[in-house]
């Protein structure tokens, strides 16, 4: 997409073409913002996004993070239906306990999950073995399972969100290094690039 000419003005400039930057650009487009450019110094996903495992566990100790991860699962399901799927695999997740104290904590998490409408269920060792046959259960006392957790390919997710952002009017420029973020009166006024 860098073959197009870099505009001299834009209302919003997103710096970075990893999963974070493309997500911001995608959501800005979803909110109706049309004067948006994204600048990436190399290729999309060429930074830390490439190294991520892409595991998506929804339940967190922080309610905001739990809601954000639940939203992410819904977004990934929607992206799977788009022209550029994100390679979302809703394979579920297992947490195991190797002590009675840890099992008590898992039971508390099951209650916490219910407050968000997440169907986190307690499972026996036999059920753990059925879900993950390679596990050694010698020190396992039990666990829990959340069927709607999963894994997404971070590179595919980035490409899917970039495609959605482009469809919404965002212009993406790769091989464009940001050299400076310029300010005046404590406000960002412009960015300087190598182009």
Predicted feature residues:
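Dinucleotide-binding Rossmann-like beta1-alpha1 core, especially the glycine-rich loop
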Residues: 53-131
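Helical element adjacent to the flavin cofactor pocket in flavoenzyme catalytic cores
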Residues: 144-195
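Gly/Ala-rich phosphate-binding loop of Rossmann-like dinucleotide-binding domains
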Residues: 25, 29, 164-166
